[in-house]
Every structure is written in C-alpha cells, then in structure tokens.
C-alpha cells in the first residue's frame, strides 16, 4: 500500500476568509436568535433580485442558493478580489429593505457572514447537494425538488436564461448536460437519508458529511481525472477505525496520514479523537510515529 506523503490537501476551510481570484465559497448568513429573514414571498423575491444585481455588479459566478426562513446559503465564485465588498452590499441592502418594510430597528443578520472555501470539485458537489437538501431536512418539503426558494429547479429544468451558472457544477459530473442533470438528481436522492446537521450549529459538519457522501457517490466520478485524496481518506478511515492498538506498520502509516489529512481540513485533535474513538494523547502519539 502506498500511503500518501506530503500530500496534505486543504479542500474545505471554514475558518479564515482566504480570498483569491477564482476562489469558490459556500456563503452562509443567518438571522439573530429565533428571528426570521423572510416573512412573506416578496421578501424572498427581493433578496433574489439583489443577488442578481450583486452577481452582475461584482462579476460573481453564482452556482446555487437556498433561502430558508431564518438563514441562507449561496455557493459562488469570485472573479475579482471583492468578496467582502459584494457581501456587504448584498446584506446591507437587504437589511435596509427589511427594516424599512417592517418598521423595525436593529440587526437583521447575526453578525458577519461565514465563507467556507471549496477548492475541490467533489467538495463542490457535496456543498451544492447539502445546500439543496436543507429544506427537505428541515421538514419544509417532502422532496427537495419541490422547494420554491432554492436553485434546485435549474438543475433539472436546465433553463437557458438564468443568472445561475448551474452548468459549472453539472459539468463536473458529465459534459453531457442532460446526463449530468439526471446524475445530479440521483445524487440528491442518495443524500436524503444521510445524517444531516446544520453547518450553522457545527461549522465542521459539511466536511464530515462530505466524507460519507463522497464515498456514497464514488461511482459518479469513476474514470474522471480527479485527485483521489478524498477516497484515500475514506479508505484509510475504514482501515483503522475502532482499532485501539495498531501493530501492522501499514496501519500505523495509514492512521498518521488520515490524521494529517483531517487536521488539514480544520478538524481539531478533539474532533479527530472522537471520530476515531481514540484519546487525544493517542492522536498526538500517532502524529509522532
């Protein structure tokens, strides 16, 4: 077995807002406490109007979105170094609209937005599916395809006139857009029964969700010329999980590599210890092996 060496790949970073041209982000914003962002249909429509304006003004490429009653998701690429300016403009304009319309004062949003950097095609697929599954997992609809305020309809209806660049995501699956659409819908359906938790509650959850999700959709990427680090991680996880004491040198190398990869994705030693059913000291010892 060839354990990867010095191949630490950061595919998903929920902490610092690393900004560079061409970077792809999963943006999350929410209302404070139990407040809501959208009271009625016109609120959703106005936010989408603003998103279209901002997308054009700041040259963003918007891949998908989901507007939930108390929070929202946007998956997008920046083509200039203007992420903060664009998001500030979007959320400030909506906050002014919301407070004016409902004759209220105070914060509409709970602090600053979160920007999760996605730098791998497979994680981009996982993020988009996570976003589109939100309404289903929140019991707002019986089928994610039925939710009105997400971009999922574009992924199966394939509109020719839209501000969404949904084809970018679908082309990861196939250059044949109709075939890619069918594959994407199948992937969404496969994601429905998976354990699901809000990234708002646990900023590392999407990374954990992706590890399971990527293994589930392995067949969709067969034959594609993509990096295999994520599949390596899943394989090594299966190899060493629930093993307290390792004697086989290959198992020892696999555990060390797995821990290094998980650390590079933002997991803490405590998180990794929990995932591998080990003590924190065992994790430190494994890194020194």
Can you describe what each PLM-predicted range is?
Residues 67:
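Conserved strand-loop elements at the edges of beta-sheets that form or border functional pockets
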Residues 1-64, 78-289:
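Short Pro-Cys-Gly-centered "Cys-loop" motif that presents a nucleophilic cysteine in a tight turn
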Residues 70-79:
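Short beta-strand->loop micro-motif that forms the acidic, two-metal-ion catalytic signature
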């Amino acid at each position: 077995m060839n354990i990867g060496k010095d191949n630490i790949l950061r595919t998903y970073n929920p902490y610092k807002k690393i900004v560079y041209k061409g970077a792809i982000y999963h943006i999350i914003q929410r209302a404070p406490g139990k407040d809501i962002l959208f009271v009625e249909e016109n609120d959703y429509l106005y936010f989408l109007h603003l998103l279209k304006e901002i997308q054009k003004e700041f040259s963003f490429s918007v891949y998908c979105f989901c507007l939930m009653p108390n929070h929202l998701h946007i998956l997008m690429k920046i083509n200039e170094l203007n992420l903060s300016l664009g998001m500030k403009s979007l959320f400030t304009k909506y906050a002014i609209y919301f407070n004016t319309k409902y004759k209220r004062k105070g914060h509409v949003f709970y602090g600053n937005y979160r920007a999760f950097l996605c730098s791998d095609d497979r994680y981009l697929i996982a993020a988009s599916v996570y976003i589109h599954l939100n309404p289903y997992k929140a019991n707002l609809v019986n089928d994610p395809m039925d939710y009105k305020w997400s971009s999922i309809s574009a992924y199966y209806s394939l509109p020719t006139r839209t501000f969404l660049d949904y084809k970018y995501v679908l082309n990861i699956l196939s250059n044949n857009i109709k075939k890619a659409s069918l594959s994407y819908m199948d992937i969404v359906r496969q994601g429905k029964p998976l354990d699901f938790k809000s990234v708002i509650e646990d900023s590392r959850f999407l990374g954990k969700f992706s590890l399971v999700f990527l293994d589930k959709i392995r067949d969709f990427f067969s034959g594609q010329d993509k990096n295999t680090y994520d599949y390596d991680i899943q394989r090594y996880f299966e190899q060493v999980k629930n093993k307290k004491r390792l004697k086989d040198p290959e198992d020892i190398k696999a555990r060390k590599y797995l821990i290094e990869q998980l650390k590079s994705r933002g997991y803490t030693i405590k998180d990794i210890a929990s995932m591998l059913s080990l003590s924190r000291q065992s994790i430190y010892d494994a890194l020194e092996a």
